[in-house]
């Protein structure tokens, strides 16, 4: 995406469309400087009620004498109810309308805001424009011309605020991480394998010297005795990997955030095989790992002053004669034994080994894991929020605030001691699954057993938000890229506190 800034509307250059924003109930665009130099009368539009300025409402007009072929009127809703999310939605609707008309270049008259909110609102507008500006069509052999998607290529902001470009570029850097994440999730599971993810990590470290990548292959995992990750992998003909990417944005500081993303590149459910209606989207079961890639990429683009390590335990959970059998017991990296009571509760197993490894070897100041862990969280929260479980109130508070800032919202769930009781096994130290009752919280409690003592830890369950079958106002169908904007916002706020 290319950005430009024009300080005066009469000096703008040729584009496919001129966008004029309106608050609901007004007939003057924001900012009102637009009408006079344009000599554009919109009385008939408002008198007929064809356009009312409702949130996300878009009306295209064809006006002669302008440098644009079209004028788009964009409704922002009620001015006294404006919020970052309302602006994301309105400009997301605009972006989708422009994509539908195959427009490439936009001249956008920016609304005027008070100084305290201006930066946040400009970022939200840019997010609304960029987040829908994505398509995954590389698997189509040929498309009819009418079906081809033409993405937005250039946005010229018309504004007196000279900081607009810097803010837009910052958002674009984060959205690049979101796109990268979506591509990994949307790709064929036969392509996006544990080995492919390892190559992606190595490719990032070649492109960005700030990243150091280490990959544990199966032989190294056996040496490390990561018994749970290896157990999940037994049914696959593809070896597992453990990917470690280290980014040192503040080498003088000992503060160190470790994020761990579930990387099940395809989840059949194992011998407890998933049914039709539940298995078809299971290429998305590595969404947590993909979000770690996107976060690392954005951290490099933004030159974040933090020390960050991302760990992705990657494997398929496939069906084979060698698949681990429900009821069998395996030893974890930590040494605790686990009775495998359901082969479709595999994500917590590979995360457990990764959490224990990070706790013992990386000296984390905080641990955050992100995973499509339980279907129960989708039943509880739908696609409106991800689940959060945490042992540390301050960490939870910071993540929740980052979620509010980005609208990748989190809802905190409890870690009551009673959930630990459900993990008791007669034949092992722990059992991996104990039925449907409280299953999201019980799964998180299982993970807690593998986190080092006194290490602040948070678990993000994104099973309901990572892959959506209905598009939203500024989100396409399927992979959402959830977690990237949230984690980057958390890291940005952390860098302000620690530096």
From Swiss-Prot:
Its main location: cytoplasm. Mn(2+) 2 binds at residues 262, 267, 285, 346. Keywords: Aminopeptidase, Cytoplasm, Hydrolase, Manganese, Metal-binding, Protease. Its EC number is 3.4.11.1, 3.4.11.10. The keyword Metal-binding applies. It is found in: Cytoplasm. InterPro entries: Leucine_aapep/pepB, Macro_dom-like, Peptidase_M17_C, Peptidase_M17_leu_NH2_pept, Peptidase_M17_N. One of its GO terms (molecular function) is metalloaminopeptidase activity. Binds 2 manganese ions per subunit. GO terms for cellular component: cytoplasm. One of its GO terms (biological process) is proteolysis. The keyword Manganese applies. It catalyses: Release of an N-terminal amino acid, Xaa-|-Yaa-, in which Xaa is preferably Leu, but may be other amino acids including Pro although not Arg or Lys, and Yaa may be Pro. Amino acid amides and methyl esters are also readily hydrolyzed, but rates on arylamides are exceedingly low; Release of an N-terminal amino acid, preferentially leucine, but not glutamic or aspartic acids. The active site is at residues 274, 348. Presumably involved in the processing and regular turnover of intracellular proteins. Catalyzes the removal of unsubstituted N-terminal amino acids from various peptides. Belongs to the peptidase M17 family. This is Probable cytosol aminopeptidase. It comes from Protochlamydia amoebophila (strain UWE25). The lineage of its organism: Bacteria, Pseudomonadati, Chlamydiota, Chlamydiia, Parachlamydiales. The gene is pepA.
């Amino acid at each position: 995406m290319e950005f430009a800034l024009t300080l005066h509307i009469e000096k703008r250059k040729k584009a496919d469309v001129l966008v004029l924003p309106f608050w609901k109930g007004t007939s003057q665009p924001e900012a009102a400087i637009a009408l006079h130099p344009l000599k554009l009368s919109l009385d008939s539009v408002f008198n007929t009620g064809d356009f009312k300025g409702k949130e996300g409402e878009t009306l295209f007009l064809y006006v002669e004498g302008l440098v644009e072929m079209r004028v788009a009127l964009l409704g922002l809703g009620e001015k006294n109810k404006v919020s970052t999310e309302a602006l994301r939605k309105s400009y997301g609707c605009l972006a989708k309308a422009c994509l539908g008309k195959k427009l490439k270049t936009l001249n956008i008259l920016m609304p005027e805001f008070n100084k305290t909110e201006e930066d946040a609102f400009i970022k939200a507008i840019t997010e609304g424009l960029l987040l829908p500006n994505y398509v995954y069509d590389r698997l189509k052999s040929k498309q009819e011309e009418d079906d081809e998607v033409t993405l937005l290529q250039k946005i010229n902001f018309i504004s007196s605020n000279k900081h607009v470009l810097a803010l837009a570029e910052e958002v674009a850097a984060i959205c690049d991480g979101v796109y990268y994440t979506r591509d990994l999730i949307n790709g064929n599971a036969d392509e996006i394998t544990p080995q492919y993810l390892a190559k992606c990590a190595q490719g990032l470290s070649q492109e960005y010297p700030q990243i150091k990548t280490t990959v544990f292959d199966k032989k190294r995992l056996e040496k490390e005795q990561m018994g749970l990750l290896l157990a999940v992998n037994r049914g696959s003909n593809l070896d597992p990997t453990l990917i470690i990417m280290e980014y040192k944005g503040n080498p003088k500081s000992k503060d160190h955030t470790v994020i761990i993303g579930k990387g099940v590149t395809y989840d059949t459910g194992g011998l407890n095989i998933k049914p039709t209606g539940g298995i078809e989207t299971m290429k998305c079961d590595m969404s947590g790992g993909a979000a770690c890639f996107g976060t690392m990429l954005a951290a490099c683009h933004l030159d974040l002053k933090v020390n960050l390590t991302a760990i992705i335990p990657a494997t398929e959970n496939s069906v084979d004669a060698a698949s681990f059998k429900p009821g069998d017991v395996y030893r974890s990296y930590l040494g605790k034994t686990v009775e495998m009571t359901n082969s479709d509760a595999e994500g917590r197993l590979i995360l457990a080994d990764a959490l224990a490894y990070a706790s013992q070897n990386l000296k984390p100041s905080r641990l955050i894991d992100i995973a499509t862990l339980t279907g129960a969280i989708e039943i509880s929260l739908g696609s409106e929020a991800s689940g959060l479980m945490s042992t540390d109130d301050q960490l939870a508070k910071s993540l929740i605030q980052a979620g509010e800032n980005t609208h990748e919202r989190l809802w905190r769930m409890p870690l009551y001691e009673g959930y630990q009781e459900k993990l008791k096994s007669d034949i092992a130290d722990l059992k991996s699954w104990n039925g449907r009752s409280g299953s999201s919280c019980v799964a998180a409690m299982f993970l807690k057993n593998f986190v080092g003592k006194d290490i602040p830890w948070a678990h993000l369950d994104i099973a309901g938000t990572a892959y959506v079958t209905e598009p939203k106002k500024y989100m396409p169908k399927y992979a959402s890229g959830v977690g990237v904007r949230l984690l980057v916002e958390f890291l940005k706020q952390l860098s302000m506190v620690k530096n």
